[in-house]
Amino acid sequence: MVWFKMMSAIEWAEKYRPRTLEDVVGNKKAVRDFRAWAEEWQSRIPETRAVILYGPAGIGKTSSAHALARDMDWDVIELNASDQRTAGVIEKIAGSAASMNTLFGSKRLIILDEADNIHGTADRGGMRAISGIIKGTLQPIVLIANDIYGLTPTIRNLCLEIKFGSVQSRSMVPALKKVCGAEGVYCSQEALLQIAENAGGDFRSAINDLQAAASGKEKLEVEDIGTAGRDVKENIFKAMQKIFKSTDCKKALESAYGLDESPEDLVHWIDENLPIQYARKDGNLEDIKTGFGYLSKADLYLGRVKKRQNYRMWRYASMLMVCGAALSKTKPYPGFIKYQQPSLWRRLGQTRSKRDMRDNIASKIGEHSFESMHYSRNNLLGLYSRMLKDEESAVEVTANLGLELEELMYLTGSAKASKKLQKIYDKAQKLLEEGKNETADPDFFKAPVPAVDNKQRTLSCPVIIQEEEEKPQKEGSAGKSDPPGPHSSERKQKTLNMGFDSLLETSEKKENSEKKENSGYLLVDDPKPAEKNLFSFSPSLLEKKNFSESVEQKTSSKPSKKGNPANNEPSKQKILDKVTPTESVQDNAGDGAKKAEPKNQKTLFDF
């Protein structure tokens, strides 16, 4: 049930959103200017390719943009604060949409909602990407902002600025009455006016208040609005009038306590309007002097609040500033006075982009120099500004810190981007693209690469695949078998050189020469056919003479004719003592084929 009510409240706000520009409540002049800008896109690309709609929340800026798209029959692409709006995302979505036409040739409206809130690490580079897209867009772009000074001067110079003001209460009443008729709820004129006044110029809030009041009811009166409406805050301009024109301290304090302003903000309002109220032709300078005396004492208490974090002193500060301003006058000051917003806030708003840019540069310097932003802002900004005077060092600083063109202008104190600054920025971007500015990893981070010794020589044993011995002849020819010996049967050998082809060819061609002393290949009697034996060893571990005899003995395909094969047993046994593998060697000497395992037999791994 609760979920249904929440969905119902959200649905009401969207249900009566303006469908066309004619349905937008209030701001008729702003709507006309907005439509005139859009109509220029029908015939040509206008000089200002983007527009900024700025003003308080809930007055119809976003609704006007969507209503315009319906009136012009344009497609809509929107990026709001819930989306990630980094430079890459903006260029991928808005940039591609701005550079391409639709399938049927119609326009595409690109809406960037809450554009003044694109800042911080999450949206790094977003402002720069927006300015680049606006310069080359082929589609209309709408930027929506609450604070016009939250946008960079570069973007503001490229756009048409249209201000949307707060909707007047009298303009809200007909629209609220139309909503009541559509929902079947009767609401008196006085109740509708009360809802509109409570909204404070926010038409969206007025609709939400109407839904809250009409929930479960079919009839609304003024009495129902008092409990169903939102908390009503005192208007600051009405409060200023009560403070300066009243002689009752209690009423003035009640008016101040009803404000949605902290004492730190209220003191600026009184400071700005005190001379306007009392510095008139019929005014008294003593009233101004007395009023500022109380105001200075209130400021002392506010300073102690910040220093000691004791917010109980707000009470004393409020009494001094409000009662002092109300009771400092020696005579009443009738007539209408147009009170003004604190000029300090206007100046801060005008310099906000510069201060944000300064802090952003200080943050980059701090990350590069391992210092805090506060220290970099106070001590290193001037140093880096002097470094930018030299063009070569300016390119390196711009590339290393990742400075934007606007930040480069700020550090050099230039009002606009000169050709020299543009050249420095382009060179820095080229360095970044080529990766020349990236610092190489230290040697201890690199994987060790073994040095290659060209003089080193390694012998590789070939893989010898031995086939099964041929089956003995028939029983009748058993007595006519070949003479006993290790080479009594034919074997097929297949060798695979492990990288030393030239060494293998030399050993095959000159098997009986003395050059075999520099190379060695072991013939392994392996009882398992097709089993690979890979061994690598150094010839220095073997006696060259015995090794040469071993190779000559192994490569001999026929037994010696000069003597009995048994006469060769001593030399054969001597060779096997040094180089035979772990496999037992079959000794065929004599009539009975006995298996002999030589004593002190060594394997290849023993070398």
From Swiss-Prot:
Biased composition (Basic and acidic residues): 506-518
One Pfam family cited in the UniProt record for this chain: AAA
Keywords from the UniProt entry: ATP-binding, DNA replication, Nucleotide-binding
Domain of life of the native organism: Archaea
Keyword Nucleotide-binding found: yes
SUPFAM superfamilies: P-loop containing nucleoside triphosphate hydrolases (SSF52540)
Alphabetical list of CDD domains matching this protein: AAA, HLD_clamp_RFC
UniProt GO MF annotations: ATP binding; ATP hydrolysis activity; DNA clamp loader activity
Single GO BP term: DNA replication
Xref: InterPro entries: AAA+_ATPase (IPR003593), ATPase_AAA_core (IPR003959), P-loop_NTPase (IPR027417), Rep_factor-C_lsu (IPR023935), RFC_lid (IPR047854)
Transmembrane feature ranges: none
Gene3D superfamilies linked: 1.10.8.60, P-loop containing nucleotide triphosphate hydrolases
Polar residues compositional bias, start-end: 548-558
Binding-site list for ATP: G55, P56, A57, G58, I59, G60, K61, T62
Region described as Disordered: 468-607
NCBIfam families: PRK04195.1-5, PRK04195.2-1
Known role: Part of the RFC clamp loader complex which loads the PCNA sliding clamp onto DNA.
HAMAP family: RfcL
Assembly behavior: Heteromultimer composed of small subunits (RfcS) and large subunits (RfcL).
Record family assignment: Belongs to the activator 1 small subunits family. RfcL subfamily.
Name of this chain's protein: Replication factor C large subunit
